[in-house]
Swiss-Prot record:
Similarity comment: family membership: Belongs to the XPG/RAD2 endonuclease family. FEN1 subfamily.
Coiled-coil annotated residue ranges, if any: none
Protein name, per record: Flap endonuclease 1
Pfam entry (one): XPG_N
PANTHER family: FLAP ENDONUCLEASE 1, FLAP ENDONUCLEASE FAMILY MEMBER
Source organism (scientific name): Methanothrix thermoacetophila (strain DSM 6194 / JCM 14653 / NBRC 101360 / PT) (Methanosaeta thermophila)
Annotated binding of Mg(2+) 1, by residue: D27, D80, E150, E152
């Protein structure tokens, strides 16, 4: 889930139209997890084809990415590569949590208890889901980048270089990796039903500007990283009873994590390695950002013939995507 710094960061609500003409590097795994968790039937079951293969992610990619591209947003998906060794403990813990959620889900179904939240917690990305996602992105003409390690680090690197305007992720790790501008809620923007409630809320995109936040908080990026490490990251457990607000207070008082640990009489294993990982992550310069002409027949053939989607809905979405590509010549500088 990454580090939670939401309580100390200011987010600016914007509209999708504010992002028109921008390139956005999308945290691929984070976005697919959102689709797999949110796009579900009332009982919590994911969308599936006639063979029982999960298709929630494909629905999200087609319809929600088409909505973004229609308003002039250009997206590039960035997928994780080999995780850092420091992440092994977190990955093992996540696997255990999903196994526990599977057991709770079966118990909830057997007893008639609302199973939706347990079903959401079982979402997994396997090789088939990843392969199908990349296949659909190719057909839609959307570029994707394979990161050598952390996808958010690669996306942040692309933003630092100026190749993209924003990084899109629900997590705050992108800021620790140095992303100048992060947009949240990109894939879930709109009117959304609250789980297990007959209540709808509007979910707007939110933008966080790193330099503005550092200035407002009176800290450096290195100090923000130290705050994240104190709270807990994908690479370490946080200090007991230390959340983002207290961590900020401690950094302001003591200046750096070393001094905080000395003052509290605490320790965090490998914290210098973790700090270095955020400051100098493994990234690649080998990528190309170019929107291509959507292959309408390929989209329809894959989703309708192989994954049992409604041909009428899919074809309409694919034609909208194609129309956006054609009309983009006069309004977007980075189209072909």
């Amino acid at each position: 889930m990454g580090v939670d710094l939401g309580d100390i960061l200011s987010k600016k609500k914007i509209s999708l139209e504010n992002l028109s003409g921008c390139w956005i590097a999308v945290d691929g795994f984070n976005t697919l997890y959102q689709f797999l968790s949110i796009i579900r039937q009332p009982d919590g079951t994911p969308l599936m084809d006639a063979s029982g293969r999960v298709t929630s992610h494909l629905s999200g990619l087609l319809y929600r990415m088409t909505n973004l591209i229609e308003v002039g947003i250009r997206v590039a998906f960035v997928f994780d590569g080999t995780p850092p060794e420091l992440k092994a403990g977190t990955l093992a813990a996540r696997a255990q949590m999903k196994e526990a959620a599977e057991i709770q889900l079966q118990e909830a179904i057997a007893t008639g208890v609302d199973s939706f939240r347990y079903a959401q917690a079982t979402a997994r990305i396997n090789s088939e889901i990843l392969h199908d996602s990349i296949r659909l992105l190719d057909a839609m003409g959307i570029p994707y980048v394979q990161a050598p390690s952390e996808g958010e680090a690669q996306a942040a690197f692309m933003a630092i270089r100026g190749d993209v305007d924003y990084v899109a992720s629900q997590d705050y790790d992108s800021l620790l990796f140095g992303a100048p501008r992060v947009v949240r809620n990109l894939a879930i923007t709109g009117r959304r039903k609250m789980p297990r409630k007959n209540i709808y809320i509007d979910v707007p995109p939110e933008v966080i500007i790193l330099e503005e936040e550092l200035t407002r908080l009176g800290i450096s990026r290195e100090q923000l990283i130290d705050i994240g490490i104190m709270c807990g990251t994908d690479y370490n457990r946080g200090l007991p009873k230390v959340g983002p607000k207290r961590a900020l207070k401690l950094i302001r008082e003591h200046g750096c994590l070393e001094a905080v640990l000395d003052a509290l009489g605490e320790s965090i294993e490998n914290f210098r390695e973790i700090r270095e990982l955020f400051l100098h992550p493994a990234v690649t310069e080998s990528y190309e950002l170019r929107m291509r002409k959507p292959m309408v027949d390929e989209i329809v053939g894959f989703l309708c013939n192989e994954r049992n989607f409604s041909e009428d809905r899919v074809r309409k979405a694919a034609e909208r995507l194609n129309a956006s590509y054609r009309s983009g010549q006069s309004t977007l500088e980075r189209w072909l």
